[in-house]
Amino acid sequence: MYFVNLLTTIIPILLAVAFLTLLERKFLGYMQLRKGPNIVGPYGLLQPITDAVKLFIKEPLQPLTSSLILFIIAPTLALTLALMMWIPLPMPHPLVNMNLSILFMLALSSLAVYAILWSGWASNSKYALIGALRAVAQTISYEVTLAIIILSVLLMNGSFTLSTLITTQEHIWLLLPSWPLAMMWFISTLAETNRAPFDLTEGESELVSGFNVEYAGGPFALFFLAEYANIIMMNALTTILFLGAHNNSLFPEMYTTNFMLKTLLFTTFFLWIRASYPRFRYDQLMHLLWKNFLPLTLVMCMWHITLPIILASIPPQT
């Protein structure tokens, strides 16, 4: 039975990822005053299926000088971790109800760095290695702010469990009292998922394609699936943390619809940013975090710690 539950979580995620690629291509097409994919099926709706078939029937080539085992393990690990991060998300019920679900997600997002590093190193290509090192530095750096922002939100939530955020946001979204945190969180998620304008790992002009330059066919598709699964997951987490989908007791079945609509809104915002903004320079990317976001998030965290203590000393107002 548990295996069936796992499949009913994984298959919709993979389908969502497939159609997110179509949505992105359509979105970029219309932003650039063209149609986007519109040949395969009505309005190009079958494009993701043909893409998947094409990629998985291609021969998975690897360089002769590559480290074969790591070369194959890296994309598999990337997708496995991307799918595992969906386990504790309440939609409205998580697959596994954990007490420390936030810590579990932080630990898994840190492990995702290894997949990128191994893929770059095992390819035995200088472009792939430079791309991987950039990705690792960027991901590790932005995880610092993500962790501090999550800590600030959890101080308001009073628990490490994601499910309790639904109760916390019953009357007001946490986005409203903590909008500076939400803005920094959203920008950090862009950097964490290596999306434009922070897609320095894939700098076509200088690094060809980044850490996955030597991958073709199936293994490349696994990296692609992992990246887009992470994007949807990060937006789902943003929705849970800041735009808690209200669990209406009259229409409890509307929770998931509400939740997915907000996640789709954030994901579309990701695509809009990609179509609108140019890429950051690497030093600007690091300065943004270490000189701007880190001091700000630390101040906000201290504020969320001191506020309850200050208010606790006020006598009850009658």
From Swiss-Prot:
GO terms for cellular component: mitochondrial inner membrane. It is a multi-pass membrane protein. It is an enzyme of class 7 (translocase). One of its GO terms (molecular function) is NADH dehydrogenase (ubiquinone) activity. Keywords: Electron transport, Membrane, Mitochondrion, Mitochondrion inner membrane, NAD, Respiratory chain, Translocase, Transmembrane, Transmembrane helix, Transport, Ubiquinone. GO terms for biological process: aerobic respiration. PROSITE patterns: COMPLEX1_ND1_1 (PS00667), COMPLEX1_ND1_2 (PS00668). It catalyses: a ubiquinone + NADH + 5 H(+)(in) = a ubiquinol + NAD(+) + 4 H(+)(out). The chain crosses the membrane at residues 3-23, 68-88, 102-122, 146-166, 171-191, 222-242, 253-273, 294-314. Its EC number is 7.1.1.2. The keyword Electron transport applies. The keyword Transport applies. It is found in: Mitochondrion inner membrane. Core subunit of the mitochondrial membrane respiratory chain NADH dehydrogenase (Complex I) that is believed to belong to the minimal assembly required for catalysis. Complex I functions in the transfer of electrons from NADH to the respiratory chain. The immediate electron acceptor for the enzyme is believed to be ubiquinone. Belongs to the complex I subunit 1 family. This is NADH-ubiquinone oxidoreductase chain 1. The lineage of its organism: Eukaryota, Metazoa, Chordata, Craniata, Vertebrata.
